[in-house]
Amino acid sequence: MFSENLRENWSFVKTIVEARERKLKKYRFFEKLWKVLEEGKNLIFLQAPTGAGKTEAVLTPYLKSLVEDEREWHSLIYVMPTKSLVFNMFERICKAVNVCKNFLGIPKRLVVSYDYGGFIPVKPFLEGDITITTYDTLLYTFYGFRPYGHHILLSLSKVIGSLIILDEVQLLQDEYWYSFSLLPYHIKNLLLFGATVILMSATLPKLLIEGIKDSLAKGRQIAKLQYGVVKADPSEDIVERGNLKVKAENGRLSDNLLKVVEGNEKPLLLIFNTVERAVEAYRKLREKKLKTLLLHSRIVSVERKQREALFEKGDSVDVVIATQVVEAGIDFDFKTVATEISPIDSLIQRLGRCARRRDGEAKIFTDLEQAKTVYPENVMKVTFKNLDEDMLSDSVRDALKASELVNNVYTQDVVEQLKSSVHEDIKRILAFVKPFTGKMFDRREFYEDEASNLLRYSVEVRCILLPQDLYKQALDSIKAKGDNKIPLEHNRAVKLFTENNLSISLPRKAIKIPALEHQLNNKKVYLSLYFSEKGLEVRKYDKIESYIRTNQIGYLIINPNYYEEIEGYHLGLVKPFDYGNF
């Protein structure tokens, strides 16, 4: 019976892969995954290198069940860390579904929906046979909280009996091990509500897996749940990609910029740890006769999507200058990657952008100063000690070596140091999460005090960049102290919120945010913009904390003086913060 299922499964994979103009490669870990699913495992850890086809492996069993009209799962919920990854995965899954409708008999009525935290003028529930969403939306709405921004509601019934894919989980890692301390108990609650969960990444830390297993070992309700571990074994699965040569270089990437650009094969990817240094590099290179592209998280949505689309279309590009946003979701084969040093799991993801289909070379510039204020010092010191060029070269195609490198850095001592400053915060959140299934409707007061940190140790705020005419109207409407409404044709308002938004992650420590401050009557204030059927509404806040506490869904207005462009090319919100003495 299983052998018959294998043949049918591979026909789905073949159809999807060939539609993407790729060659079919029958990896053994696909079959191992399908087998543990068929055995009824509730939780599966899947680790395989980037570019090995993990997405096709997890999609196939669900799509096949639709053809047979005997659903194994009520729906499929595909979860990504960021909204840009949600949008990219939505397009990818839609293409896979469409080709399967045409050639394999998937029902035409199949619905694919998504929510990536962006603006949505109509507020439906997060429904669909296949739903792509973010970790934040999944978890906040699962617990009954509406988070900041425009997030669709997810009903508990959507989770029951669904297949939930937790992808690119490594991108949740933060400087305090905060998300990874909470995630095991969130997963436990999803399992208790009848979901099947697949957790997958190229770099899964052993301590995260152990934390999840520990959470499952506690409680009578969880006793019948079973988990499986699937890893791509390099002795069985040789990932088809080019050979990668990694070299550690002394010094700073920014100091060697021209040397790297002029002396290495294109296309070339340059990865910086901060937006400021990425923009500075772009300024230096824009005079060169090279097709250069800048990509980071603080560029308005419409511009960022256009640039990301260049990769999917396969348009020729010489140099891409980017930040951490390229660590996942970019399907482009770079001949050369040059990066600032970053934590070992981050480095493996960065190196994975190179030599995907042909041989390539990667350079890691090892000046630890370039990681300060961005990554934890103890993690960076241990990463530096574990910069093994040969192992890093192999890590992009060998999941076992990637695991060894990651686990050498994220030891118990290192993780305990990361958690030490937020230990009490973690305890407060877990006091709500752990007993959730038994006390679903208790302690609603938790929302006002703690819910904003249910997953991440920061607050994400949505921002909007207004054209000069609307920005002036927004200021004038507040100065008038009357009606704060701005008349605007409906379609233009929808376009504005859809295309001119971006997000900023605010640390919990106090900082100034001049990019969101506006001068009104000799006083600095924050302004938020709200969408209505009749146009726009502007509201004023003396402190950003006031806006956050109200849990409003308005977008904070960006001071246009801080959003930079060069001859119409968006550099983005380069320096939104003022850390002062912090």
Question: At which residue positions do the language-model features occur?
Answer:
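Conserved pre-motif I regulatory segment
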Residues: 2-47
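Conserved Walker A/P-loop ATP-binding site and its immediately adjacent core
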Residues: 72-97, 204-208, 275
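Conserved helicase motor
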Residues: 112-122, 273-276, 292-306, 321-327
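Inter-Walker segment of RecA-like/P-loop motor cores
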Residues: 98-146
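Interdomain hinge/linker at the junction between the two RecA-like core domains of SF2 helicases
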Residues: 206-262
